[in-house]
Amino acid sequence: MNRPICLWMTSRSRSSLVSKIFANHGVWWGDTLKKSRGYDTYENQVIKKIQKDIIKPKSGTLPYLEELDLTEETQQRFHQSLKQHIEDTMAKNCEKWSMKTGVEYFNAWRGLNPYNIFIKREASAIAKSISEKRIGDYESAFHAANWRFEYMNRIQKEHGGVFINTDDIINGNYQGIREAMEYCGIDYNERAVESAITR
């Protein structure tokens, strides 16, 4: 199984846009279309279910503001299930594959040495979006977004990776995308970026 590209996200960060940009660059993401609040999520629904079935937090349900503490047995079972799904489903000529998921799941993926792509947006904008969509309240969403971004910073410091600010993409600044593609060993294509954006 090739090294995964993990698109680490928090809610309402425009992570589906980033996943679509990677898909437009030829990265396999599962081709399991699902709409959420009117947009395509570009999230592998099969892997999402595998992950949800195997990976559990110590308390509550994910997404949850804690670093996962997993047994070696759980990690091995998760990795074996991923490998089986990838081998059974992904085209043999496809070299790169991605998974878009909450950064809380990092410890489940860490042993696979993923390319770490951290998707960021202003925490206040995320909280406002969550509040306006009536998904949750502003204060809780703001706190959760900041916790996740701090966790992303710690992961990057220890394991490497690239941040992509989706506000920059919307405003026409693709530098973060360029750096992410270079980091993942993918040839950058600006047309693939532009075609993913709906303005």
Question: PLM features: residue spans?
Answer:
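PAPS-dependent sulfotransferase catalytic core
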Residues: 1-81, 199
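Proline- and acidic/polar-enriched loop/turn elements at helix boundaries
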Residues: 33-35, 166, 192-193
